[in-house]
Amino acid sequence: AEKQYHQQTFSGAFEITALAGNLTRMDGKPYLHLHITAADPHHGVIAAGHLNSATISATAEIFVVVCKGRVGRRADAEIGLNLLAF
């Protein structure tokens, strides 16, 4: 089976109802892995999944918690994912 994410694009003003994930480094570059749930209050649409990109229209209340130590990412060819590396 092919290991891939299926991307969808949504447009309009959505409200972030949940956002969770982590910011690590892979190959010396920042690596974001975010999961989002967002709601379109005018059309009753809920979208959820991996967040690849977004534009904040006004504000977003996002808190970042810094952990002690270093956490990175490494590619695991066997399962086809970039795994956390402590």
Language-model regions, residue ranges each:
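N-terminal intrinsically disordered, cationic/polar leader segments
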Residues: A1-L32, T37-F86
